[in-house]
């Protein structure tokens, strides 16, 4: 990826969380590109309450100013409760009514029985300032695992990141390549270590699990030439009904870390997944166990861990799941990919 583009993307990442005393509770913080779906005249929660009056804008595209983007009008298309941090459609709003989505209100749904289950046509995107902001992810020290990675980045020169996982890592529901979490993280690292020339190669296996990650190793990540760092994230498909139990999943991840180190000579970061739609029929709805298994695998394999699950759970304390899911099942939208990247930034090394 071009260095200038990486730096530009890093600025996009940074714009979404600019704080006085980054992430501290109760601090003023700007949020950009937060996604919502709004039904009828029911209020939808933002990530934070105590929104600064007059700071909120709402549009139809993730990127402000994109051709064809509609900027909605407060008081005409929506109303804001600034203290509570909610947005509500008006009765005659131009904002798409999410109650017309085929999965709205469905319980235990089988997505194969519905003609279209995407949320993209219903998303709106908010920019605002809150005076009650906090960190998206808890910082944690991973320097004992990533010290050599830091040395390589500081030294400069080519630095290759390989990403290996399921359809989320393959970019599921991100609208542009640069908005996928691994490219956002590469942009963050590029800005932090300007001497490095960072590239990303994704070799993910959409629709499959950690077992296929092992079985098809040579066909996928085995083809990457001299990666320095591998971002490895399975779990969304493992977690489905009929998948392996968390212990087997953990062992698979430990095996993958060992294979990557021995065969490719790369350091590894394992990252957890988030809970899919609670109303989806095919989920086992025990993602907390798979997230914990990922953390345990990282500890056992002595590699770094990015805690995506906890970041997602923090956001879900206020927001509904559909407002974060591009396919309304298990793929994050652009804002969700940004949340993933925040979990990576929280690793300090």
Regions found by a protein language model. Give the residues of each.
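Bacterial N-terminal signal peptides
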Residues: 8-16
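Bacterial N-terminal signal peptides that target proteins for export
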Residues: 1-8
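Solvent-exposed loop/turn segments at secondary-structure junctions
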Residues: 167-171, 205-211, 236-241, 274-278, ...
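A short helix->loop->beta-strand "cap" motif at the edges of active sites that frequently abuts
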Residues: 263-267
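Extended beta-strand solenoid/passenger and fiber regions
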Residues: 21-84, 88-96, 102, 109-134
């Amino acid at each position: 990826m071009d260095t200038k583009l990486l730096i530009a993307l890093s600025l996009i990442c940074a714009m979404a969380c600019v704080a006085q005393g980054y992430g501290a509770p109760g601090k003023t913080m700007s949020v950009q590109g937060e996604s919502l779906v709004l039904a009828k005249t029911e209020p939808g929660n933002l990530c934070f309450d105590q929104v600064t009056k007059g700071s909120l804008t709402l549009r139809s595209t993730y990127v402000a100013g994109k051709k064809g983007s509609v900027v909605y009008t407060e008081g005409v298309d929506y109303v804001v409760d600034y203290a509570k941090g909610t947005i509500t459609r008006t009765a005659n709003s131009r904002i798409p009514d999410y109650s017309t989505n085929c999965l709205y209100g469905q319980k235990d749904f089988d997505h194969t029985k519905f003609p279209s289950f995407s949320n993209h046509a219903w998303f709106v995107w908010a920019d605002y300032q809150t005076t009650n902001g906090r960190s998206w992810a808890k910082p944690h020290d991973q320097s004992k695992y990533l010290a050599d990675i830091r040395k390589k980045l500081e030294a400069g020169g080519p630095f290759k990141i390989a990403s290996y996982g399921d359809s989320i890592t393959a970019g599921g529901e991100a609208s542009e390549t640069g908005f996928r979490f691994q490219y956002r993280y590469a942009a963050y690292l590029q800005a932090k270590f300007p001497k490095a020339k960072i590239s990303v190669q994704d070799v993910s296996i959409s629709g499959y699990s950690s077992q296929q990650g092992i079985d098809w190793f040579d066909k996928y990540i085995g083809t990457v030439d001299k990666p320095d760092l591998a971002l490895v994230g399975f779990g969304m498909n493992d977690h489905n009904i009929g998948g392996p139990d968390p212990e087997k999943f953990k062992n698979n991840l430990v095996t993958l870390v060992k294979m990557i180190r021995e065969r490719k000579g790369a350091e590894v970061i394992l990252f957890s997944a988030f809970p899919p739609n609670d109303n989806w029929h095919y989920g086992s709805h025990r993602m907390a166990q798979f997230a914990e298994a990922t953390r345990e695998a990282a500890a056992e394999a002595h590699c770094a861990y990015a805690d995506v699950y906890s970041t997602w759970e923090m956001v879900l304390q206020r927001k509904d799941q559909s407002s974060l899911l591009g396919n309304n099942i298990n793929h994050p939208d652009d804002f969700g990919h940004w949340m993933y990247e925040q979990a990576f930034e929280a690793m300090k090394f």
